[in-house]
Amino acid sequence: MTAIFEYTVHANTCHDVLNYAQEWEDLDLAHPPFPATPGYLSHLQSITDPVTNAGAAPGEPNGSSIGQLRTSEVVMSSPWELREFTLQQMPLGAPIQNVLRMDTTKQTPDRQFTADAALQPVLENYINSNLVDICNQEHAVPNSWMGMPFMAGRADFFPDTHFWAPGIAGSGSCTNDDIRFNFSVNTCSGCHGGDAIDPALDPPFYHVHPDSPGGSPVQLSRFLTGTGSSPIPDPSPISGIGRDFADLDRRATDLQDLLATGCLRLTLAS
């Protein structure tokens, strides 16, 4: 079982966002990333402590910046399961007012909507009702759709897990293959399953492997480091194009683009 604590950075203005981005750029310029020297670790902690320390967010529950806690487990047998926990308010009079309780797994419908042919029309209806947002990867999966619970209480993983339904349409510059991919890769199950990991080449599930040998760089997935000449094949019946990834490079490019933009241009763009 593994767990990840995901925090919210409370950067409330454009200048706050740019200043926070500059802190990460300064860290990169000041230190080589490996090996992690004491100076690097101290500099890194000066960036993360203001976000993760107790009381870092006085206006939030328990004064915490925690956004969600996510766990992955495969205790007895397959499937691998991911769950999400958020700080939730307890009834008045409870000894602790806000505690971590299980929540829905965001952006991820229940797997039955792709695995059960009788329920696939519900997934198809949601996707085809939100084609423009899915094409732009700006959609938000709702808790319910067509009068029934839609969001998953847990995300199940098999080596080729993905979301698909017959009748998915295209929109604008996005083919039906693009629409299916954009929707599925943004789910927990697809990103850690068949949409971003090739079971023929890649270790299952993890993008950052917890069992890397001590004293050596952590093992990262090809989704992060780059797929090179072996793109991730489409796992769905659409049999679409293979997809190339290099997400660490994408994030670095996004950071540089942000730093080069400036607040005036960001304000005009918004």
Descriptions of predicted regions:
Residues 1-157, 195, 228-237, 241-265:
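Conserved small-residue
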Residues 10, 131, 170, 184-187:
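Secretory pathway export signals and precursors
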Residues 147-175:
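Short, charged low-complexity linear segments at domain edges
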Residues 177-183:
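Short, flexible, mixed-charge glycine/proline-rich loop motifs
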Residues 181, 190, 203-205:
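C-terminal structured domains
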Residues 185-195:
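The canonical Cys-X-X-Cys-His
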Residues 198-220:
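Gly/Gly-Pro-rich "capping" loops immediately C-terminal to redox-active cysteine motifs
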Residues 268-270:
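Short, solvent-exposed mixed-charge patches
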